Every structure is written in structure tokens, then in C-alpha cells.
């Protein structure tokens, strides 16, 4: 599939920040951030040590279609929930259902069509931004952080910043927040084919 999900990461909550936790610490430790809540650290090197999520079979099946690391031996969904969802008390089906829905909305957008149409090709950041702007407005291009690796640069990650109060509604021009940095992709990058 041309667009998969790695996770849904809530930003630093004000309640956690008020206890002296900064953004860097929150991004590193998530729900295991000390001094609160007192949850074990979710470690990427031991994803399967994370507790079971309690996902329904229906949601697990949908999630496996958009998150290749879900289920099986990687335990990505367990790790992601333990790190980013457990401390909020999110219902696992709702949390992962949101990921599935957002993935589908992005795929059906002009940005998603742009990615699909240019699979395996070199594209410009300007053209990617224009496709995103067609769906949600030029001002919301700043909500997208693109990460590239290699030479030539291959697009490896897309992060989209969404307002907390908009996460459960269909994406609209009012859904997004600007990112502090647009990412490290230069003027052009390759939209990599899966498996290469």
C-alpha cells in the first residue's frame, strides 16, 4: 500500500507539562514520562513486552490493512498504544479506529492522490504542498512535516499535526496546526516504492 500508519501521537498535554515535563521528554517517553503517570516505559527494542491493547478482532483486522507492523511478531500496535494512548485512557478501538479513518481520508485527498500517482517517482516539495493545499488550504501546508533519508532523498515519513478538538471529526481546513519545522526533505524527493 502506498500510505501506511505508524502511530497517532498526542502532543504534550498541559496537565503533564504543568508537572515539569518538557516536549523533548514527552516525545521520548510518552505515557511513561515521569513523574506521571507511573507506567512502565514502552521500549522500541522490546515492543512485544508492551501490554496487549484489548483491540476487537474487527478493529485489529482494519488496522492490519493500514499498519503493516500491527499484530504478528512486531507488536507495533502494542508499543504505540502503551507509549501514546494508555495514559489517556483511550478506548483502544476508538484510538486505532481514528488511525484507520485518518489514513483513509488522507488517501482520498488530493495529497493522497498525488502520492499514489507519483509512486516510485521524483517529485517536488512545491507540488506536494500544492496537492495538500487543494484539499485543506494553503495555510495548512505548514501542518505537514516530511522526513527524507538517503541520497537521492527518499520520503520515509509524513507527520501531520491535527488539533486535539478536531481529531474525531472528518478532516477540514480547521483541523490542522502548524508544525515547528517542515522536515528535512529538500526541494525534491523520491516517493519510494514499497519493498525497494
Give residue ranges: language-model regions.
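Domain-level detector of nuclease and nuclease-like folds
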Residues: 1-196
Amino acid at each position: 500500500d502506498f500510505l501506511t500508519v505508524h502511530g497517532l501521537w498526542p502532543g504534550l498535554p498541559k496537565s503533564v507539562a504543568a508537572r515539569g515535563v518538557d516536549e523533548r521528554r514527552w516525545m521520548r517517553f510518552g505515557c511513561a514520562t515521569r513523574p506521571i503517570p507511573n507506567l512502565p516505559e514502552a521500549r522500541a527494542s522490546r515492543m512485544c513486552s508492551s501490554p496487549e491493547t484489548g483491540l476487537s478482532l474487527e478493529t485489529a483486522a482494519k488496522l492490519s490493512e493500514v499498519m503493516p507492523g500491527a499484530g504478528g511478531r512486531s507488536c507495533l500496535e502494542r508499543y504505540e498504544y502503551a507509549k501514546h494512548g494508555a495514559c489517556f485512557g483511550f478506548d483502544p478501538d476508538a484510538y486505532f479506529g481514528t488511525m484507520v479513518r485518518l489514513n483513509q481520508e488522507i488517501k482520498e485527498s488530493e495529497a493522497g492522490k498525488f502520492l499514489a500517482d507519483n509512486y516510485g517517482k521524483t517529485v517536488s516539495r512545491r507540488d506536494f504542498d500544492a496537492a495538500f493545499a487543494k484539499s485543506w488550504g494553503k495555510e495548512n501546508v505548514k501542518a505537514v512535516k516530511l522526513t527524507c533519508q538517503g541520497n537521492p532523498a527518499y520520503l520515509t515519513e509524513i507527520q501531520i499535526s491535527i488539533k486535539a478538538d478536531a481529531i474525531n471529526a472528518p478532516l477540514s481546513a480547521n483541523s490542522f496546526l502548524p508544525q515547528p519545522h517542515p522536515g528535512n526533505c529538500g526541494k525534491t524527493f523520491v516517493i519510494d516504492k514499497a519493498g525497494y
